[in-house]
Amino acid sequence: MATFDDVKAVVVEQLSIDADAVKMESKIIEDLGADSLDVVELIMALEEKFEVEIPDSDAEKLIKIEDVVNYIDNLKK
C-alpha cells in the first residue's frame, strides 16, 4: 500500500482535501471534486513524484484512485 499512501499524499495536496476523503474506490472527479484542470495538475504532480510519464491517452482512463495506484505500480515493475 506504499504507492497508495504516496498517491494519497499527492491528491490531498493538489486538491486541498481531507486525507480521510481519499480511498482506493474514490473517483477523482465525482467523489473528490476535481475538475479538468485539477486532473491535469494532478497527473503532472504524480509524474513528478513517481518520476514517470503518463500519456494523455492513459491519463483519461484513470478514473479512480485505485486505477492510479495500479497504473503506477505497473510502471514501476
UniProtKB/Swiss-Prot annotation:
Main location class: cytoplasm
GO biological process, one term: lipid A biosynthetic process
One Gene Ontology molecular-function label: acyl carrier activity
Biological or metabolic pathway of the protein: Lipid metabolism; fatty acid biosynthesis
Modifications made to the protein after synthesis: 4'-phosphopantetheine is transferred from CoA to a specific serine of apo-ACP by AcpS. This modification is essential for activity because fatty acids are bound in thioester linkage to the sulfhydryl of the prosthetic group.
PROSITE patterns xrefs: CARRIER, PHOSPHOPANTETHEINE
Family: Belongs to the acyl carrier protein (ACP) family.
Residue ranges occupied by any Carrier domain in the UniProt entry: 1-76
Name used for this protein in its record: Acyl carrier protein
Keyword ATP-binding: no
A GO term from the CC aspect: cytosol
Alphabetic keyword roster: Cytoplasm, Fatty acid biosynthesis, Fatty acid metabolism, Lipid biosynthesis, Lipid metabolism, Phosphopantetheine, Phosphoprotein
Protein purpose: Carrier of the growing fatty acid chain in fatty acid biosynthesis.
Places the protein is found: Cytoplasm
InterPro entries tied to this protein: ACP, ACP-like_sf, PP-bd_ACP, Ppantetheine_attach_site
Modification sites for O-(pantetheine 4'-phosphoryl)serine: S36
